[in-house]
Amino acid sequence: MGFLHEAAHELVGVCIPSSCVGCGRWDHSVCPQCAALSSALLPQWELQEAGNAEYPLWELSDYSDPMRSIIVAAKHSSRLDLSEFLFECGVNIGLSIAQSGMLSVGTDATSLWVVPAPASWKRRLFGQGITIHVARGLAAAVGGHSEVTCCVRDVCRLDPWVSSQAGKSSEQRRQSRHGHMHATQRVPQGVGVIGIDDVVASGGTMNEMFRVFERSWVAGACIARSRQ
């Protein structure tokens, strides 16, 4: 049965050749050049405003092609596994955070929780969340290249009735997340939080995570930043 399944998969690949989800290059699900973006890009950070406060927000890329197309495929393709790419994006950001000195300045945290942005109940039900892979990569890099112990804690949830952000304006995105997240576990004293999202556009999701974990918040991080 396994042989037949593998043979059928190979036959589909021959009959319907794939193209790179990032740039469209023929006969590659993800071409080497696009795959290399996860480690080749240099993460940057800026201060993100959140009401009367602000915090560091790390980003790996602008939300433009080919990164945009890769992220869209990761979120919506049921046939393509991009978890390794997402993990390496997290590693890249985590290395930059660890090497920046940010963790030894302005925070008393001796350990970190890396908290992925909450997926909708539908994505959680079908295992379609992608930020968890980025969080795992970031935690591995920070924990391996700093004196701070680091682990992934999936402890942020959306209220179940909250709708998708797709098709909403910036203001609608902010309003749809405001007040609709909660932590499933209290963050212990001496533990800092880094929040992870795939894309930050209006900042609604990341700022709501900041509200939930404000007392413990160290920084936010994302694969891509949309400035439209």
How should each PLM-predicted stretch be described?
Residues 1-228:
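Glycine-rich phosphate/pyrophosphate-handling loop used in enzymes and phosphotransfer proteins
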